[in-house]
Amino acid sequence: MKLDNLAPQPGAKKRKRRVGRGIAAGQGASCGFGMRGQKSRSGRPTRPGFEGGQMPLYRRVPKLKHFPLINRKFYTVVNVGALAGLAAGTEVTLESLMAVGIVTQNDGPLKILGDGELSVSLSVSAAAFTATAQQKIEAAGGSIALV
């Protein structure tokens, strides 16, 4: 192979269709657009989604909002105020809260929220803490551990 004998692949260089150059050319007169109708007029084609004047599908269906998060993480939530009734020095986990009856069903990992007051020192192990809950547990002399 040399530069002087390079050639394009067969069928790679397709000729442009010359329309409106007489009937013998094959694309004369109506230029392949047929006889009459909207598709043969100038300014064609119609815009995408046009249904001939009928109310289009994208306007017939309602505007949907508030799609749920696909991979949303659900937590079993407990407020700090609910932990105030436990004895000082208690190890708080999801299992221990279910045993005591503070949590009735397991909805996922434990998350501690900051509503309520806490005066006893507790050792809390949970998957997540709000900033307020963390401050209240540590202010009461307790400790937190992320699981």
From Swiss-Prot:
Residues 23-35 have a biased composition (Gly residues). GO terms for cellular component: cytosolic large ribosomal subunit. Keywords: Ribonucleoprotein, Ribosomal protein, RNA-binding, rRNA-binding. Residues 1-55 are annotated as: Disordered. GO terms for molecular function: rRNA binding; structural constituent of ribosome. Gene3D superfamilies: 3.100.10.10. Belongs to the universal ribosomal protein uL15 family. This is Large ribosomal subunit protein uL15. It comes from Synechococcus elongatus (strain ATCC 33912 / PCC 7942 / FACHB-805).
